Amino acid sequence: VLDYIRRFVPIPKKALLAGNSVGTDKMFLEANMPLVIDHLHYRLVDVSSIKELAKRWYRKAFEEAPVKHGGHRALADILESIQELEYYRRVLFPREPITREHAREVAREVVELGIPKIGEEEN
């Protein structure tokens, strides 16, 4: 597995582990393939998290996502996760030009909203 990863991402700590519920995959790799874990970046791309956000924030995008048919077979799961991530990338993260000014404006707005304190009542 490590040789395969190195063919595409030879530099250590650059390749991301990605997939659906990828935390479980990471635990398996930690227990059984520590050299693979050592080569991977520490961050994960969990397609399930993106799916959950789409379900809550972009319901139509969630409802139109490609249907899975893999039956929880390893290769089918991998290919369907790639397909699902590509779908969400195109629908939720379009490649429209985003200016730094717009990004700064949104960042200011979000910061101005503040972070609610735990136990604080909503008005």
Language model segments and positions:
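Metal-dependent phosphoesterase core characteristic of DEDDh/y 3'-5' exonuclease domains
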Residues: 1-123
